[in-house]
């Protein structure tokens, strides 16, 4: 197993990565929550972290470099058809906000998967506005 850590601006670094050289790309790119007029918590409205969605070029680069790709918020981008969408069902969790579920596009040839486990490690507070629970990421 070879692991290489690269420090840099991902938008610049991705351009130099050879096609299909990354075993798994799991990403949650900005999809322009403000530009979609989504309901936002007051604390998020004052931040510009998600002002502009990822461009088609950036999404295509993600698709090019990954062998297996998972794109959270994939329903906001122009992506190829997929049989295997991941669905994070958030309805039953009192502390969740915004949507009842979150969708992730994948290039995996499998059936749709629905994640319903409790996000147990979210009680300690978030360090990122779109943070995913650890058990959800393990499930990916």
Predicted regions and their residues:
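Class I S-adenosyl-L-methionine-dependent methyltransferase catalytic core
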Residues: 1-139
């Amino acid at each position: 197993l070879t692991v290489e850590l690269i420090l840099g601006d991902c938008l610049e670094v991705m351009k130099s990565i050879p096609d299909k050289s990354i075993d798994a790309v799991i990403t949650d790119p900005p999809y322009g929550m403000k530009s979609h007029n989504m309901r936002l918590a007051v604390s998020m409205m004052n931040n510009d972290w998600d002002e502009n969605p990822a461009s088609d070029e950036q999404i295509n680069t993600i698709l090019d470099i990954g062998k297996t790709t998972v794109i959270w918020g994939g329903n906001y981008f122009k992506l190829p058809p997929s049989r295997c969408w991941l669905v994070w069902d958030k309805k039953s969790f009192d502390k969740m906000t915004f949507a009842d579920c979150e969708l992730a596009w994948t290039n995996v040839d499998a059936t749709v998967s629905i994640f319903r486990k409790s996000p147990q490690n979210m009680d300690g507070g978030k360090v990122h506005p779109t943070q995913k629970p650890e058990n959800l990421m393990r499930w990916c």
